[in-house]
Amino acid sequence: EFISYPIYLWTEKTTEKEISDDEDDEPKKDEEGAVEEVDEDKEKEKGKKKKIKEVSHEWQLINKQKPIWLRKPEEITKDEYASFYKSLTNDWEEHLAVKHFSVEGQLEFKAILFVPKRAPFDLFDTRKKMNNIKLYVRRVFIMDNCEELIPEYLGFVKGVVDSDDLPLNISREMLQQNKILKVIRKNLVKKCIEMFNEIAENKEDYNKFYEAFSKNLKLGIHEDSQNRAKLADLLRYHSTKSGDEMTSLKDYVTRMKEGQKDIYYITGESKKAVENSPFLERLKKKGYEVLYMVDAIDEYAVGQLKEYDGKKLVSATKEGLKLDDDSEEEKKKKEEKKKSFENLCKIIKDILGDKVEKVVVSDRIVDSPCCLVTGEYGWTANMERIMKAQALRDSSMSSYMSSKKTMEINPDNGIMEELRKRAEADKNDKSVKDLVLLLFETALLTSGFSLDDPNTFAARIHRMLKLGLSIDEEEEAVEDADMPALEETGEESKMEEVD
């Protein structure tokens, strides 16, 4: 296709030509040698045209598309790049961005890389062979499915690489000396990231790019440890302070409060699901910005991206969230409240048993009565949801990664204060046990977990509704007979305490 000399093909071409009926009849009139008088209608009919097919032969240039990567970038117009991109990829749209460069030194090669405007529908299809980068040696096409040439997460980048230094064996299909390929790969990744940063200079273009290929960038953060920090600069997220716009990690750092050491984030199913999460109550009140990471792949990316610009990334839903900005007086009040709620924490733990690892007084919630947090190194509620959805999941792994939950209670909440009073008055109060179980199940939902037994939860809610509506107790008793057990006996509770 890109041979330097022209290649022509002798082709047959069929064209349609219009001729009038008069032209067709002229020879006949000459032969007859007589002139006839005709009326106007016949004259109009003769004025009509008919089509005939003409066959012609000509030489057609086959290799019209010249190897533009051999020319200087400043000499090539935007239209030439667009034409080359369309011929290379069979795309009907123009490209979003282009990077034309040459590398010189121990290894020399020239390349043109393109970013398309939209992602192909089979971008993450594992059965599809990667054929986005075409490899040429001295302008002779060698292969387009060389997996060593570019990492999988950059599978959407299209382009051409042409090197005079690549040695080939007889079959032309197997490349020798992988060291050369590694050098080319390293340079291609570097230039791709440069190209993405150039796109980021135009907000409108970058929004299109990010919408189409943000998953690829996050996959790169998970897989490419060498370029993780550079790829992190390209990430964009909604946050508690960004409104409808998305913010970069770099901009987040510039807006950090004085004395703030960490970058706070929350993961979840959607922006709507996390923006009113109980985990954000104290952070919002204190004026801290929190990033909303609501893409499933964010869980994997943030698992590898431990820090950015020297700032640790801290999840708002896990243990280890410390906000050391309280005055000495506030700290003293908190300690007093923790002591007064110690007994309630023990009672709740006895009622819930193995469902939670421990019950503590919370520092992170302001309005909600309670929430459930996970271990610092375990799965978040969102990650647990993602792993449950895996068709081929490893159940043995999920048993220890979905670590025991810690229940955090809010001492300033009216429900908790009333519960504390009732529990102190009578530890075995039936209503206390029912309320604790109901609070635990609602905390599961608000914290992003799923219920193991939704029917029991629904039955408990219905029971509360009956009490609120003052429905006949006899009718209620009939309903309760069919309901699953909501509480333990006093003896069972004592046995757990001994254990």
Swiss-Prot record:
Q: What is its main location?
A: cytoplasm
Instruction: Provide this UniProt record's keywords sorted from A to Z.
Output: ATP-binding, Chaperone, Cytoplasm, Nucleotide-binding, Stress response
Give the start-end ranges of region Disordered.
Answer: 15-51, 474-499
Per UniProt, ATP binds at R172
Provide the Gene Ontology terms for cellular component.
Answer: cytosol; perinuclear region of cytoplasm; plasma membrane; protein-containing complex
Q: How does it assemble?
A: Homodimer.
**What is written about domains in the entry's comments?**
The TPR repeat-binding motif mediates interaction with TPR repeat-containing proteins.
Question: What protein am I looking at?
Answer: Heat shock protein 82
Q: Which species expresses this protein natively?
A: Nicotiana tabacum (Common tobacco)
Taxonomic lineage is: Eukaryota, Viridiplantae, Streptophyta, Embryophyta, Tracheophyta
